[in-house]
Amino acid sequence: MKKLIALLATALLAGSLYAHEFADISPTDVLAAANAKTAVIIDANSPDSYKAGHVPGALSFAAIKDNLAASLPADKNTLIIAYCGNPHCGAYLRAAKAAEKLGYTNIKHMSAGIEGWNDAKLPTQPGQ
């Protein structure tokens, strides 16, 4: 029994060492960053969702993922904000981790997603 408990504790500890979360940012703070043009905002939703409406100025990850580096600024400290559908959606992680892999260090997650953005009655932009 002690070995089982030790094994479980080790597994939990190892899992927490590799867990990675990006700091959350509220929809109103994202809107402020969008208006000030101080961040790159990445929509990690499907192309259809992006076309239906996204945060103004947001880039579609589906459209840029194969050449992400060309879509991001040279300054690796630039604020990168990734979002997807709602707090239960994990699609944003692909975009956030891709930016992190390119060396970006200031990455945040709008966990409310486009659903929370819409609930807050913030403006959206139709996609292309």
Predicted ranges, named:
Residues K2-A6, G15-T28, A39, K51-A82, ...:
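Rhodanese-like catalytic fold shared by cysteine-dependent sulfurtransferases
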Residues N35-A36:
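Short strand-connecting beta-turns/loops that link adjacent beta-strands
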Residues I41-D43:
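Structural scaffold elements adjacent to functional motifs in cytosolic proteins
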Residues S46:
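Short, glycine/acidic-enriched loop or turn micro-motifs at the edges of active sites
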